[in-house]
Amino acid sequence: MTKIIQISDPHIVAEGKLAYGQVDTSSALKQCVAQINKILPDIGPVDMIIVTGDLTDFGTSDEYNLFREIIEELNIPYRAIPGNHDNKSVMQKCFEDTDWMPKIGPINWEIDFQDLKVIALDTSIIGTAHGNLETASLNFLRSALNSAKEKPVIVATHHPPVMTGIEKMDIQNLRDSDELKEILSTYKGELKLICGHIHRNIVTQFGNVICQIAPGVSHAVTIDLREGSPNCLTKEPGNFLLHEIRDGILTHQIPVDDYDGPYLFYPE
């Protein structure tokens, strides 16, 4: 029964700095790591952590090194894909010692478990906030799905290919997604698409597959569905997702912050 934790959009900045002058993203990721370590006996074993983009805020080597220093306090294998805030070439250099980071080209990878296949796709474009999938990435997806042999599949991207109603984020989402939808629709087994970027837990349909957008671990994009609304963040509690194979792909949301309990409903 494979279990995957999804962490999204940590936005690590230089130590001692605040993202957007407001958010201590390093402390938030440290708290996320502490929370996972704390509850691991209750939810584990966890097979892998996937970070769905925006590991850093400015894509510097110092930020990536700090990200690694924090995330590697977990004794769980992890992999990542870039988001629009990441610098692909710097990211590749900072993770060149790992067995999953491609040396050149899009940062795509796949991994097979006994009852699940995870396919991760690079949607980032240097110099732009919105996402797109290169032909090489679409071909990578086709090949990976062909080898999945109808076992459950999770496909991960940073940019979601759906509209959320949050106008300033929707213009930054994945563009030209029709080919992605067509490829996913041909898969005969169960398939779930997981994304980041929006910093909110949103579930919708993309063609014939479920698409789930993960919340951020440190801050949220403000939910403002009015036309012309400003692009804002709110300091909502951070969360991460746990995906597991249990009569299909099941997803739990877990808060980053510490909390009281557990308490018996009916203590003796």
Residues covered by each model-derived region:
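Active-site neighborhood of phospho(di)ester-bond hydrolases with catalytic His/Asp-centered motifs
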Residues: Q6-S8, M48-D54, Y78-N84, D122, ...
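Active-site-proximal beta-strand elements of phosphoester/diester hydrolases
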Residues: T2-A14, D115-I125, I154-A156, V209-P215, ...
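His/acidic metal-ligating clusters that form di-metal
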Residues: C32-M48, H130-I210, L241-L242, I249-L250, ...
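Short glycine-enriched, charge-decorated loop/helix-capping segments at active-site entrances
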Residues: L18-D24, D97, G127, I166-N173, ...
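Binuclear metal-dependent phosphoesterase catalytic core
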Residues: S26, K30, Q35, I183-S185, ...
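Active-site environment of divalent metal-dependent phosphoester hydrolases
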Residues: V13-E15, D57-D62, N84-M91, I126-A129, ...
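Extended active-site neighborhood of metal-dependent phosphoesterases/phosphodiesterases
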Residues: S61-S143, D176-G189, S229-I245, L250
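N-terminal active-site segment of His-dependent metallophosphoesterases
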Residues: M1-L66, P106
